[in-house]
């Protein structure tokens, strides 16, 4: 589980017993500012959407930092499918927070193995002030991508992944 108030990640076993915790508030690698989502790849690596630091941090099962990626932008939600395709929901870049450089709000799709971003599904309401696009994201085996939206619109939107 990711706990935003203490900026730590906690690991539990299947019976709910606490195994370990790691991280603290900060901007250095291994620290967090609003860990907002978690996902596991096929290798058992833990991907943490560290939204406040505009990055993904990747850890092993013991909480050791393996890598830090910035190319997926400011993620609120993260999902990795059985083929190690990474889906990241950025609900705060662009018109919501112009300080986040040239990032465009939307869902980024790429590789959990190489870190390459392959596609962007832009926010369908790019001029909306506030959080209007997906904060949560998941995909099914048929290529449908679902975004859980918050803000004035709310609800679930379905997107179809572009064919390469």
Regions found by a protein language model. Give the residues of each.
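Eukaryotic scaffold repeat domains enriched in small/polar residues
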Residues: 1-164
């Amino acid at each position: 589980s990711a706990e935003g108030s203490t900026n730590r990640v906690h690991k539990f076993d299947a019976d709910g017993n606490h195994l370990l915790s790691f991280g603290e508030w900060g901007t250095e690698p291994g620290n967090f500012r609003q860990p907002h989502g978690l996902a596991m790849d096929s290798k058992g690596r833990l991907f943490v959407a560290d939204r406040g630091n505009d990055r993904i941090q990747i850890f092993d099962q013991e909480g050791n930092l393996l890598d830090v990626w910035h190319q997926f932008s400011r993620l609120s939600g993260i999902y990795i499918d059985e083929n190690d395709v990474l889906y990241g929901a950025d609900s705060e870049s662009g018109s919501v927070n112009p300080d986040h450089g040239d990032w465009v709000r939307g869902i980024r799709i790429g590789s959990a193995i190489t870190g390459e971003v392959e596609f962007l599904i832009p926010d369908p309401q790019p001029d909306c002030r506030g959080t209007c696009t997906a904060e949560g994201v998941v995909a099914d085996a048929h290529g449908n991508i679902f975004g859980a939206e918050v803000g004035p619109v709310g609800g679930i939107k379905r997107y179809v992944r572009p064919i390469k």
